[in-house]
Structure formats: C-alpha cells, structure tokens
Amino acid sequence: MRQMALLPAIDHHAILPSIMNNIKRIVLTGGPCAGKTTALVRVIEHFSNLGFKVFTLPEVPTMFTQAGMNYLTQNPDFFYEGEKATLEIQLALEDKFLRMAEACNEPAVIVCDRGAMDISAYMQPEMWERITRDVGTTTQQLRDERYDAVLHLVSAADGAEQFYTTSNNASRNEPASEEGLRIARLLDKKVIEAWTGHGHLRVINNHEDFEAKIRRVIKEITNVLGLPQPIEEERKYIVEVEGEMPDCIESDITQTYLVADPGVEVRLRRRDWSGKVVNVHTTKKRVSGHEEIITERQVPNALYESLMQQADPYRQTIRKNRKSFIWKGQYFELDTYLNLPEPLTILETKGITEDEDVRFPPFIRVLADITCNKKYYNYNLALRR
C-alpha cells in the first residue's frame, strides 16, 4: 500500500514557532461509512511525526448513543433534550480542549470527529433554531466562526457502494441495503448543506484507491496549518450544460485580486447564496519552484469593504455563478462567468488523482481540457484588456 509521504524537505523548526499561538480547530465530517475513523488515525500519525500535539475529539452522538440516548425516539421532549445536551457537550469538549492546547509547549491542532453543525442535519430547522437560542448561540457562530476548516468525506454509499458497510459502527441506523444506500446519500447531502457557507469547506471525494482519499485529507490539513506543500493542479474543462442538472448548491461569487508583492497572490472572495454572505481572504505564496503556502481567513463585511480599496487596478473583479454537486462520488464545481467578453463555463474537479478517471455526468459536454492552461487561471482571466 502506498503511504502518504512526509512533507518535502523544509525547515520545520523555522515554521512551527509561528504556529504555536495560532491553534487550528478542524472538523472531519461526512456521510455514513465515509472513512473518518481511518482518516483520524492517519492524521494523528502524520502530524505527530511533524512535531504537532494532535487532539482528536470523539463523536459526541456516538458517546450519547452508547450511554443510552435514542435519537430515533418518538418522544419529542426526550429528543429535544437529548439533541440540546449533544450540542452543549460538543461545545464544552471543544472549548476545554482548546484551553488545553493553548497550554501545550509544542504546536497543537484540534481535529473534531464531526462538529456542531452536524447536529442540525438530523432535525427540522425550527427545532435547531430553538436549540441554538436556548444554548445561547447562533447558526452563523457555529458554522462560520467556530472552526478553521471543515473537511467532508463523501459517504461510500455515493460512488464506492462496494465498500459500504455498517459493521464498523454499531450505533449506525441506516442498513447496508439499497434503501440504506439511499438514506446514506441523503444524510451525506444534508451534512454538506449544513456546513455550506463555511469559508474553508472542502469535500473529499471517493476514489478507487481509498489511500488517495486519506492523502487528500492530510493535504487539506497541511494547507490549513500553513505548511508548505507541493503545488497541484485540479483538472478543469470548458463545458456546455445539456439537460437537467441534479440537486446542487448554487451561489454567486465575486472574486477580486489585491495588490501584492512579486510571487504572492492575494484574493478576496465574496460568496452569496440563499441570502447569506461569506467573505474569504486568501494568500498564495511560492516558497520554491514546486511548493507554496496557502493561508485563508474569513473576514467581516467591514474589513472586506476596506480591503477592496487595495484592489489591483490592472484586474477586474470576476463575477460568476457556481453550482456545486457530487456525481458518482466525485465533487464538481461548475462556474459560469458573467462579466467576461465571451461566454465561458468551466467545470473543475476536486481531489481526483492523476491516474483516476473523471466520471463526467451525462448533462455535461466537454469542449476542451484546460488543466494547467494558465490562460484560464482566474488571476489571468481578471486582467483588464
């Protein structure tokens, strides 16, 4: 089995001190039978070897189920109290471990086996609003402000059905049958929707090689921690849409490039969907010919407007409509550009390995493969002509 290589030869001792006072809290979530348990073990091993103290918080609903909670109860009062207690313990665990991490003498990272918004996927929105109000918090605080990154592992029920099983989690309620697969896919979608809007939500595809899925998790956490990593190109295609698309998450995006030093790319992105707005500031810095450091942070509206004053005068703001969807276990983003001289629609894959085939949906007609074609980088599309 091919193992995840350690990071390229870099001076970790020079980098780790800057991470000491910037503890990251990361959610590892996903649909049923997505591979979270294995991923957590590998995350501990990999980042411990790099000098990190890795705290992995257990899945709270599983703890509650083992202690006697019945999430399928028909008693609404019992269900409400159980879900409210689940959220309270989830937040308390995270806060206590953050205090512990701050007291460590080495850099630390907190990885949560599911996070607060996962709880919302298993109830009606009205009950979730009541619970958050009674706990003294809001959806915006829990989804947008609490965690540095959310990594969603797609359920094996979507694209890797041959590996779907319930034997590794006795508390799992969806059976390993056609109906169970349907329920698992539905839960997978509901969890993604619950986290949609977080500035660093990443969907980790299913792969023919499960090891590739684990490598993707480690790569994304490496990115969140601000450690150098090899530069990789996601596959991109100019496409036309033919026929009806499946359920997708639709959003409008404005992307502005700011004035930056040579070798540094600074981007300000605003994403608007269903009346909600999230702003993300991203910096990409080359540290060698084949390595880069990417840092992302969510910014409030006031800071967004202030940073817009630093817009690169030689580049226009890119405006596009994005439809995000999963097809046969693979995650896609379909961007339709709205303010370019010529119509342009680009389909981008996420996390598909070089030796893996892209499973194009039947409603997509590929016109050209533009992977690695710098002409179609957003940074270059934004150039004023």
Model segments located where?
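Conserved substrate/cofactor phosphate-moiety recognition/catalytic segment
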Residues: 44-89
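Hydrophobic anchor at the beta1->P-loop junction of P-loop NTPases
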Residues: 28
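Phosphate-end processing signature that detects enzymes handling 5′-triphosphorylated RNA
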Residues: 145, 203-206, 211-212, 218-385
